[in-house]
C-alpha cells in the first residue's frame, strides 16, 4: 500500500555527506514542532505520553550549505534591493564561507541551491507549475532585471506564497568539484 512521503530530500550528484547530515536536516525541520501528547486508555485515564509533531510549526524548506567552486561563496543568499544589487556588481548577497561559519543558529535566506535541501510534502502543491524554471526577476523600477536559475526561482516563488527557507550553518556538506570544498 502506498504511503505518502513527508519530505523530499534534494541532493546534487557532487555533494559529499554522511547520514548524520540528513538527520540534522530532519531536526531543523521538526525540532520547533515537537509536542508532548497524552495517551489515554479507554476510560480516559492518562497512561503515558508520546512525542508528536505540530504540523503547523514544521519548517517547510530547510537546507544545509556548501561552498561553491570558488571556495569562498556559499549556496545560500539574500535578495538585494535594486540599489544594493547594482552596488554589489549585479550579484546577489551570497553568504561567504567566512560569514556563515560565524553563525551559530539557523537563519532565513531568500534562496538556496538545491544541492542539500529538504522540502516538506505539500510545498509543491501550493506552487504554480512548472516549479523549476529559470525566470527573469524584474526589480521594482523595471530598469533592472536578473535571470535566475531554477533553484533560485523556486525559492522566490515559495517566498511569494508565504513559505520561508531556512539554513542551518552547522549543516555543511562537501561539494566535489576539482577538489572537495
Go through each PLM region and give its residues.
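Short aromatic/hydrophobic "clamp" motif used to bind/position activated sugar donors
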Residues: 8
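The conserved acidic donor/metal-binding loop of glycosyltransferases
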Residues: 12-16
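Catalytic donor-sugar/metal-binding loop of nucleotide-sugar-dependent glycosyltransferases
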Residues: 108, 133, 138-175, 180-181
Amino acid at each position: 500500500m502506498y504511503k505518502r512521503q513527508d519530505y523530499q530530500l534534494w541532493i546534487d550528484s557532487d555533494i559529499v555527506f554522511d547520514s548524520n547530515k540528513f538527520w540534522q536536516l530532519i531536526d531543523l525541520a521538526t525540532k520547533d514542532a515537537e509536542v508532548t501528547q497524552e495517551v489515554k486508555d479507554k476510560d480516559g485515564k492518562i497512561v503515558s505520553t508520546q512525542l508528536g509533531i505540530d504540523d503547523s510549526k514544521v519548517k517547510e524548506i530547510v537546507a544545509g550549505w556548501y561552498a561553491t567552486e570558488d571556495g569562498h561563496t556559499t549556496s545560500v543568499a539574500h535578495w538585494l534591493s535594486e540599489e544594493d544589487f547594482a552596488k554589489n556588481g549585479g550579484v546577489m548577497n551570497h553568504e561567504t564561507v567566512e560569514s556563515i561559519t560565524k553563525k551559530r543558529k539557523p537563519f532565513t535566506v531568500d534562496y538556496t541551491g538545491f544541492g542539500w535541501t529538504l522540502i516538506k510534502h505539500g510545498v509543491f502543491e501550493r506552487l504554480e507549475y512548472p516549479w523549476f524554471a529559470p525566470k527573469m526577476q524584474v526589480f521594482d523600477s523595471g530598469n533592472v532585471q536578473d535571470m535566475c536559475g531554477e533553484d533560485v526561482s523556486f525559492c522566490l516563488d515559495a517566498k511569494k506564497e508565504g513559505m520561508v527557507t531556512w539554513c542551518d550553518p552547522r549543516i555543511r556538506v562537501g561539494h566535489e568539484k576539482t577538489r572537495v570544498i
